[in-house]
Amino acid sequence: MFENVISIKDFKREDIEFILREAEKMEPFASGEKSSSALRGKILGMMFYEPSTRTRLSFETAMKRLGGDVVGFADTGATSAVKGESLADTAMMLSAYSDAIVIRHNLEGAARYISDVVDVPVINAGDGAGQHPTQTLLDLYTMKRFFGRIGSLRVALVGDLKYGRTVHSLAYALAVFGASMSFVSPPVLRMPDNIIHDLRRAGVEVKETERLDDVIDEVDVLYVTRIQKERFPDPEEYSRIRGAYHIDGSTVADRDLIVMHPLPRIDEISPEVDSLPQAMYFRQAFYGVPVRMALLRLLISERRGSENQKIV
């Protein structure tokens, strides 16, 4: 079906729908209600050159829930990268020890580069300001589980749309399903022109604004993102705009929408929102486990001809 997970643009609508159906089958295994040995004896290699909490831990959980194991690193300071070992050599080494590789890197294109070097499946867990396809799949899964559909949804993407790789991937995926989108950001953090051009060329309805009030009464999903401090070239400019959008209880309490966030949040969503029925971000984070379980099982067991084709 597919050999790697590098960019959401590599997937057709039917591919995404299939993955989401497989993810739903994984939910009782993800929660621990049922146990699986589908990837028993298999090893997932982890290459994390940037910090991660949810993505890394959910991949580890996903692999272990399927009966497999995990090796790798989350701190390059403890690897030979500090001695100057190249990305390609590190990937080749890890591919010899594992059945698939998950990589997060600060450089756009890093995941696709190593997919051309190694002979095991590669999953992009975020490449700079580029793509984050597995986050997009769990975002779509969250919408599908709540609304029962993705097509025809009205989604507002709010915050750092320039450097936020999650919104880059999500915008392309929503376009495949025919959802309409509103982009809410300061001018300096607007969605890149090439993405807007691609969406409009595909016939997608796109609205741009600096004001959340312009669109909040029109949307089903409020997808909020943090300002990417680590990618911001000017610390003073970051300090000036970091609080441009702040979602609190009064923002959403009486509105028929859900609030999503790829996390971590800084101060863009008040903790008082957490207890409201509109808050979906913690559930969204959990859905990373069944979605990534589905991907790992499809990539590893089907590619390697594993005898453990069944979930259990």
Swiss-Prot record:
EC number: 2.1.3.2
Known role: Catalyzes the condensation of carbamoyl phosphate and aspartate to form carbamoyl aspartate and inorganic phosphate, the committed step in the de novo pyrimidine nucleotide biosynthesis pathway.
Enzyme class: transferase
Upper classification of the organism: Archaea, Methanobacteriati, Methanobacteriota, Methanomada group, Methanobacteria
SUBUNIT field: Heterooligomer of catalytic and regulatory chains.
Reactions catalysed according to its record: carbamoyl phosphate + L-aspartate = N-carbamoyl-L-aspartate + phosphate + H(+)
GO terms under biological process: 'de novo' pyrimidine nucleobase biosynthetic process; 'de novo' UMP biosynthetic process; amino acid metabolic process
Transport in keyword set: no
Keyword Transferase among UniProt keywords: yes
GO cellular component, as recorded: cytosol
Pathway: Pyrimidine metabolism; UMP biosynthesis via de novo pathway; (S)-dihydroorotate from bicarbonate: step 2/3
Residues that, per the record, bind carbamoyl phosphate: 54-55, 104, 132, 135, 263-264
Source taxon at top rank: Archaea
Keywords, in A-Z order: Pyrimidine biosynthesis, Transferase
List of residues binding L-aspartate: 83, 165, 226
Pfam family membership, one: OTCace_N
GO molecular function: amino acid binding; aspartate carbamoyltransferase activity
Family according to the record: Belongs to the aspartate/ornithine carbamoyltransferase superfamily. ATCase family.
Name of the protein in its database record: Aspartate carbamoyltransferase catalytic subunit
NCBIfam families for the chain: asp_carb_tr, PRK00856.1
